[in-house]
């Protein structure tokens, strides 16, 4: 059980904050007011470069995203800002109407948000809402056209960050698939990226157009996680509750629908690439030494294979560990 918890923390690089330096959990009102007055992000579209998320907030968001299944979910993150950094100390879900492709915050959600934040302040927790999160079940961490519009509106009121979690890829890979983003001002044209391969991720064919149309309107922040001595105790209690499910479940069965969709999407990409090669060959076009489209397809296939192999190895290890347990008791009873 403890090994499973430590493995999860190592996979997601969650660092322990020294109890004497738990300042990340203490809201610094003076620093927050000074930054809000100076508004350095208004002059530099890339001002915010990183986001630090507490382990408990990460678990809350991940479990919420997982509970939505194939439907998108949405919530808010509480915290504060430091120079060039968002600090997220907690998160809470919103009662919103979600579909498989979008999530819409209605009037009920807005009323709930205001009421919840006021209740937190009444209880002495002065952290502000610094961002919103939502899920992309099975199609990666990026901002769609609707997400970009939502983030643009939120940034008008001050510093705000958008976080996206893919619950299906999280279960399949064994590591939280998460991304944090901020949009650029309308009158700003970002410089072209030097190496797009570094930020490459698998995008389903049905989402490729939406992804490409808005990818230049936002940038990603570096995401890291932290925990305090209190978080260590809370995580221990959570693992006491869920360690049986961790051992009994297999990603091969939990995400088999997701795996099937990934293979189907890959086959469609291969067929499209083959048609493109045939048409270029019939026109007598010159062949390029490196076909970027085919290279991406190969990388997609390698990722699917690695996740399937990882699931098979995990199942094999569990079988070796638990095979034969209980047989001696049954033999003695007979």
UniProtKB/Swiss-Prot annotation:
Main location: cytoplasm
Ranges spanned by the short sequence motif JAMM motif, renumbered to the chain: 134-147
Matching CDD domains: MPN_RPN11_CSN5
Region ranges (Disordered): 273-294
Enzyme Commission number: 3.4.-.-
Molecular function GO terms recorded: deNEDDylase activity; metal ion binding; metallopeptidase activity
Domain remarks in the Swiss-Prot or TrEMBL record: The JAMM motif is essential for the protease activity of the CSN complex resulting in deneddylation of cullins. It constitutes the catalytic center of the complex.
Full protein name: COP9 signalosome complex subunit 5
């Amino acid at each position: 059980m403890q090994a499973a918890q430590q493995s999860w923390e190592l996979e997601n690089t969650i660092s322990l904050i020294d109890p004497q330096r738990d300042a990340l959990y203490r809201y610094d009102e003076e620093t927050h007011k000074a930054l809000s007055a100076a508004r350095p992000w208004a002059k530099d579209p890339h001002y915010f470069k990183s986001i630090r998320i507490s382990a408990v907030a990460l678990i809350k968001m991940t479990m919420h995203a997982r509970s939505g299944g194939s439907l998108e979910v949405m919530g808010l993150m509480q915290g504060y800002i430091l120079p060039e950094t968002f600090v997220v100390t907690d998160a809470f879900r919103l009662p919103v109407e979600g579909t498989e492709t979008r999530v819409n915050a209605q009037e009920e959600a807005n009323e709930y948000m205001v009421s919840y934040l006021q209740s937190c302040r009444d209880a002495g927790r002065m952290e502000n809402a610094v961002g919103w999160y939502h899920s992309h079940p099975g199609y990666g961490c990026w901002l769609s056209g609707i997400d970009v519009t939502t983030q643009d509106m939120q940034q008008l009121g001050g510093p705000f960050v958008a976080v996206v979690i893919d619950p299906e890829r999280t279960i399949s890979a064994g590591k939280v698939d998460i991304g944090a983003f901020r949009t650029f001002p309308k009158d700003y044209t970002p410089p072209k990226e030097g190496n797009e391969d570094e930020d490459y991720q698998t995008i389903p064919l049905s989402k490729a157009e939406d992804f490409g149309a808005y990818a230049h309107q936002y940038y990603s922040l570096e995401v890291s996680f932290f925990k305090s001595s209190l978080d260590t105790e809370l995580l221990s209690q959570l693992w006491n509750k869920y360690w049986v499910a961790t051992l009994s479940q297999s990603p091969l069965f939990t995400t088999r629908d997701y795996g099937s969709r990934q293979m189907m999407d890959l086959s469609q990409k291969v067929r499209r690439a083959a048609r493109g090669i045939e048409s270029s060959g019939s026109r007598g076009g010159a062949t390029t030494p490196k076909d970027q489209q085919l290279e991406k397809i190969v990388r997609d296939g390698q990722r699917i294979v690695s996740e399937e192999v990882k699931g098979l190895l995990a199942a094999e290890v569990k079988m070796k560990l638990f095979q034969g347990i209980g047989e001696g008791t049954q033999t003695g009873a007979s």
